């Protein structure tokens, strides 16, 4: 027969009365203000930043009045990533990526802070006075309104102090967030069901002597409630060995083992009880005297006296406030075997903090009850220990999961801890926030570091979000992706230009469809001609640059006035030879050959004039239509060793991109230059590169340079001054190969010690069950983190640069009549099936 006398309704025991003006009011007249807490991302915080956060908490807590309680509550709930599989607008590769990550498990972390004002009597009561043990609760009236006003003013101060730090942000919770709405449960609903956000439904709660059960979940509670359980020393942070090297440190908060590093459903409660410090110290003085007088009867009394005296000495000499503290880890599972494993895991995590794990079964029910948001004043005093604010704050968690960018635009990377997809905007949102002043990017990664996978992954997502992408490549890295786009758009897009002797790439730098030549267009033509004329180590004088600029302007005036003259390099050469040279001879102020050797210029440029060996290059009669094509690859591997052609082809491709950029208003444009940047890294080209980067920024575009050779950037001042200094986003891949040279890289890129530590942690602790490479992304020296480039099998087969795999894909596509998408789909299924066998 059921014993109904032991059953109570939640309503009769519920300790909270109402939510008034954003404050929770308990039936014992305690006032609580609740906040959501935003912490910095995991693996991105330095020791100095941890100390700054610790200092901010300390300053904020000191403004609270006596008999206040600080209750920080960290929720860690296991969830599965839900892929957007029903989204009909996804591309083939985007859908494959969503399938790959679908149901990927991770820990969802949310942090709450409750500031409670109670009274001396409530703060001193023990577990047998908990509201859980009393009969029907009669609401009490708030008697001292002045104290409430002072507390609310202190809370405002507390909020300002915390929000003045760069690392932490707290936001007051609304009534709807606390108690919920008809459509969605609030925080209180979640606590009584131990469920994830938005899925709360109240469960039966069984509070037994040896077991606490919420619905189907059985709870286990580990507490730090006695100084005997604590380590001898504490600190704000500790070294995380798995991501550290002999040259770099990865830091985590002291409490991180019971945070995200504990892979189970759990709540980590952190309580600080702010009492009357002077009264506490006075009571300890009295205890010390009593212990001294009883010391002759027991050695333990003598030892206790010494401990109390040491506590008092530290308090008085350093001006520290005496407080009480308590910390507990509340974990749960519906499976007994899993719960047994969780108990071991929590115990191990506490042991990593050098704490003595204590599995608490005696006060589990009252501690669970005190953990109700807004009910911290119900905490049993015997479960706390005396300490100071500074050491107690070391037990606060100080980092959280990677966060999605609050932006519609971005790329999908993966969290390096769990592999959960992260939406990351490295272009628009940082510009809007002033983190960066341009969208340009510099990418450095040695061979085999996953550089091509990352760039393929990035440009594919930019393209799918409407960007115009132009790639200058020297290794067929983008052939698979380009072919896939070409096939999908039925030839309308995905254009792949390859330089061959039979079909060389040709251009017309003097062509514009409307005969409009702005200053930038004229400058780019001059830069091109100077590059054709002078070698990298030859100096260009102001007279030479000025005369060539005058010649270009005069020729442009001619073709604008007389449309019968075809704009091309041939007619420019003829104008320079037949008209401009004679005009120079007629001038009153003569220009000598030593100042501007026009004959030398004509001789050097003759090879690009009709009949010369490169006469095809600058005299194209059909202008490449870059305007409507959104994905274009120029593969110029065939000319990368040709010192005459390589710079010219690279410059003219960039010039073609700039022309495209000027005409496409309000549309994102990207030019990515792989190793081809070496062709333009000369002293003569420095101004042009700066001009390109400046122009790109003004037209909603971004220039990206990719390299794999460290020596190239260390030894080239042009790269530093023209490319690196104009790229606010820096992306580095695995640099372990260059560990001994990294100081030079650090100096060249202007990296901080924090950024260096992050970069050297790349791929140090990869999950063997997942196939991915890590990449570091730094934005303007203000934001940086390491992410995982993890792709589906379909994406892998599209991006791969491994010759045998590329041949396999192309052969299968040939068998299917050129259908590369079906070929990739078939091969991906086969490879997944083989892996599972």
Language-model regions, residue ranges each:
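Extended, folded cores of ATP/NTP-driven motor/assembly subunits in large transport
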Residues: 1-399
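P-loop NTPase motor core of the ASCE superfamily
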Residues: 100, 516-570, 717-837
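Short secondary-structure boundary/capping segments
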Residues: 85-90, 127-132, 374-377, 484-489, ...
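P-loop NTPase motor domains
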Residues: 47, 51-63, 355-356, 366-422, ...
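Short, cationic low-complexity segments
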Residues: 132-161, 353, 445-450, 798-823
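Short glycine/proline-enriched loop/turn "hinge" motifs that connect secondary-structure elements
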Residues: 23-29, 102-107, 317-322, 414-416, ...
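Conserved P-loop NTPase motor cores
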Residues: 427-460, 469-478, 495-503, 637-757, ...
């Amino acid at each position: 027969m059921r014993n109904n006398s032991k059953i109570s309704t939640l309503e009769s025991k519920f300790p909270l009365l109402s939510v008034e003006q954003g404050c929770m009011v308990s039936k014992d007249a305690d006032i609580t203000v609740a906040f959501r807490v935003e912490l910095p991302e995991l693996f991105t915080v330095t020791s100095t930043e941890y100390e700054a956060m610790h200092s901010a908490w300390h300053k904020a807590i000191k403004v609270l009045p006596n008999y206040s309680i600080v209750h920080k509550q960290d929720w860690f709930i296991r969830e599965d990533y839900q892929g957007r599989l029903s989204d009909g607008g996804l591309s083939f590769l985007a859908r494959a990526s969503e399938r790959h990550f679908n149901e990927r498990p991770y820990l969802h972390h949310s942090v709450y802070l409750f500031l409670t004002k109670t009274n001396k009597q409530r703060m001193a009561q023990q577990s047998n006075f908990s509201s859980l043990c009393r009969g029907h609760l009669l609401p009490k009236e708030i008697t001292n309104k002045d104290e409430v006003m002072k507390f609310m003013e202190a809370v405002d101060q507390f909020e300002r102090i915390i929000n003045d730090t760069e690392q932490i942000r707290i936001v007051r919770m609304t009534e709807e967030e606390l108690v919920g709405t008809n459509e969605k449960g609030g925080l209180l609903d979640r606590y009584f069901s131990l469920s994830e956000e938005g899925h709360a439904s109240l469960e039966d709660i069984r509070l037994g002597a040896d077991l606490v059960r919420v619905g189907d979940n059985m709870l286990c509670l580990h507490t730090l409630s006695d100084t005997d359980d604590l380590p001898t020393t504490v600190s704000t942070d500790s070294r995380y060995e798995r991501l550290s090297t002999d040259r770099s440190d990865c830091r985590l908060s002291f409490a991180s083992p019971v945070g995200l590093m504990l892979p189970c459903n759990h709540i980590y409660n952190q309580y600080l009880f702010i009492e009357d410090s002077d009264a506490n110290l006075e009571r300890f003085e009295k205890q010390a005297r009593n212990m001294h007088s009883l010391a002759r009867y027991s050695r333990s009394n003598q030892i206790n006296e010494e401990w109390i005296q040491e506590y008092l000495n530290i308090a008085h000499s350093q001006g520290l406030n005496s407080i009480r503290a308590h910390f507990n880890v509340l974990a749960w599972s519906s499976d007994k075997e899993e719960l047994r494993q969780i108990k071991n895991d929590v115990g191990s995590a506490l042991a990593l903090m050098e704490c003595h794990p204590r599995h608490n079964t005696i006060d589990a029910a009252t501690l669970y009850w005190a953990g109700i948001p807004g009910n911290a004043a119900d905490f049993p005093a015997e479960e706390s220990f005396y300490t100071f604010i500074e050491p107690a704050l070391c037990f606060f968690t100080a980092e959280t999961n990677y966060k999605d960018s609050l932006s519609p635009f971005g790329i999908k990377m993966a969290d390096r801890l769990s592999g959960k997809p992260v939406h990351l905007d490295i272009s628009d949102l940082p510009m809007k926030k002033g983190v960066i002043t341009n969208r340009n990017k510099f990418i450095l990664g040695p061979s085999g570091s996953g550089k091509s996978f990352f760039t393929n992954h990035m440009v594919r997502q930019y393209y799918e979000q409407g960007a115009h992408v132009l790639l200058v490549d020297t290794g067929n890295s983008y052939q698979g992706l380009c072919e896939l786009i070409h096939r999908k758009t039925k030839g309308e897009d995905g254009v792949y230009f390859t330089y061959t002797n039979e079909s060389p790439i040709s251009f017309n730098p003097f062509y514009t469809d409307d005969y409009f030549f702005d200053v930038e267009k004229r400058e780019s033509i001059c830069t091109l001609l100077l590059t054709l004329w002078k070698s990298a180590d030859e100096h260009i004088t102001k007279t030479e640059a000025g005369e060539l600029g005058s010649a270009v302007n005069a020729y442009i005036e001619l073709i604008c006035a007389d449309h019968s003259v075809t704009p091309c390099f041939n007619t420019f050469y003829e104008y320079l030879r037949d008209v401009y040279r004679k005009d120079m001879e007629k001038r009153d102020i003569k220009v000598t050959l030593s100042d501007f050797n026009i004959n030398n210029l004509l001789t050097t440029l003759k090879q690009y004039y009709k009949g010369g060996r490169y006469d095809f290059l600058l005299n194209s009669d059909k202008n490449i239509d870059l305007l409507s094509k959104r994905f274009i690859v120029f593969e110029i591997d065939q000319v990368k060793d040709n010192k005459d052609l390589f710079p010219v082809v690279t410059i003219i491709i960039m010039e073609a991109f700039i022309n495209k950029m000027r005409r496409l208003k309000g549309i994102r444009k990207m030019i990515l230059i792989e190793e081809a940047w070496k062709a333009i890294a000369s002293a003569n080209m420095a101004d042009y590169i700066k001009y390109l980067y400046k122009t790109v920024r003004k037209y909603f575009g971004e220039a990206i340079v990719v390299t794999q050779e460290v020596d190239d950037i260390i030894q080239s001042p042009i790269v530093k001054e023209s490319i690196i200094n104009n790229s606010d986003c820096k992306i580095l891949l695995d640099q372990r190969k260059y560990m001994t040279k990294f100081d030079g890289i650090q100096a060249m890129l202007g990296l901080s010690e924090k950024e260096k530590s992050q970069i050297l942690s790349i791929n140090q602790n990869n999950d063997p069950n997942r196939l991915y490479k890590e990449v570091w992304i730094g934005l303007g020296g203000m934001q940086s983190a390491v992410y995982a480039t993890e792709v589906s099998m379909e994406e892998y087969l599209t991006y791969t640069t491994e010759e045998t795999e590329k041949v396999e894909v192309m052969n299968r596509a040939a068998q299917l009549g050129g259908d590369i998408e079906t070929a990739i789909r078939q091969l991906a299924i086969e490879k997944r099936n083989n892996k599972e066998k």
